[in-house]
Amino acid sequence: MPLENQTIDPTAQRAFALNLDDSIYGNFAEIGAGQEVARWFFAVGGAAGTVAKSISAYDMTVSDAIYGKTKRYVSRDRVVQMLDHEYGLMHERLDGLRGDRTRFFVFADTAAAKSFSGGNDCHSWMGMRFQHAVRSKTSDILLHVRLLDTTNARQQDAVGRLGVNLIHAAFHHWKSPRTLIEALLDNIGRDRLEIDWIHVSGPAFKDVDNRLLCLHLVRISYTPALLFDTDGTPLLASESIRRSRVLIERGRFAPVTRLNLEMMARGRIAFESDTSRNTPSRTAPHTADQIATGERGESHDMHDIHEIMEITMNNLRDRGSAEDADFLARVDLLSAVGKMVLVSDIGAFHSLGEYLAERHVEQTGLVLGVPLLRELFNESHYKTLDGGILAAFGRLFSHSVRLYVHPTRDVLDGRIITADTLTVAPHLSHLLEHLRVNGLIRGLICDESTLRTYSSDDVRSRICSGDPAWRELVAPEVAAHIERNGYFGAACPQAPDTRPIMNQP
């Protein structure tokens, strides 16, 4: 039905505006969830001004004949194949006819919507290749989205609206990529779609850092977390850590300290021992010192256990706001010591466990210090959660999660506190003992005579004050990066409260 004869819908308005722009012309290729994006342009009227071609190669054999064989049909590789094929054909057929007055584009998506039998992961890969100016080189936008609606029809509707928003935003907001991202869920909502990965490339985005775009997805609550590889490259968590063992340590890491690395190394030894009974390990044995310093040996397989340092948005805002430069510095330093990074807006540990379970992580180990374990037994954090602390712990440990607790030295009397000697409120002591006896909370072993307790803020304060002793508290690679790039030395605000952060559930 033409736009003038129906109630004005924001998505319809955008599709109609694109149809009226005679400089924009392109192809649509959609697999799965119907042809929901192209449908909007036909429904509002004037589609001849925008749509050169619309195709849906739904049958796998037909799809392979057109785009080539693929291992997975709902994948980034398939979307790129579709963009390559469709844009090549369009350019060959139409460039000579209207290339001097047209900004060509191809939109492609491949989706796995809710099936008749149910039980499948509902998600979509979506891509856009376009000219930001007449005769310009092409630029690409690729994104992954989780479909959160509970019915196939609603998921199709959400995919259609997102596709229209993407095309409209690409042509109208390419100069401001963050504005482009913020426009994607207009008239859809975060309760229906989760955009958990994005990548842009080409001349329209020549100065854009994709790490910062992905951080923005977390900052504006388009996704609860985003994973970065050991070289800082944004990853899709549901692919990168699927069916794997994951060991996570939460902290500020501004900068990452020797103690952080020692905790992770000791946690890995215990986690590997616990989980190898069910998961064959291909990893050669190591000492904590070897792992912490990067001396892993030739037979080490980093894909066996993913070591991830998690920075929550609260920790990233520890000095007021989540500044881009500060974020990049932390990721850079963690990359220097070979760690993956998870930036999350997930406060409660049980919510983190659920996030990882949704990404099909097989087993999870959480490395933490005694102070944070003590905070986990602070019932005030669970006031708004039905079932309180019992519900929180039940949700946490129901997803194959274990806690690995590093000892600490009491700052007042110097005594060593471990997971076994920690005391909590009397009415919670039996809960703590139950978790310890059943191996869900495990104490890590270290040489207590050399145990030092210090934080990232202590190191940062030493850097700011010019105390050279800070170099002893970080790995050599970290010290080299800090000195080379001038991290943390330019601005030295007062350090925040360093007590463990526990967000409300």
Regions inferred by a protein language model and the residue ranges of each:
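Nucleotidyltransferase catalytic core that binds NTPs
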Residues: 2-505
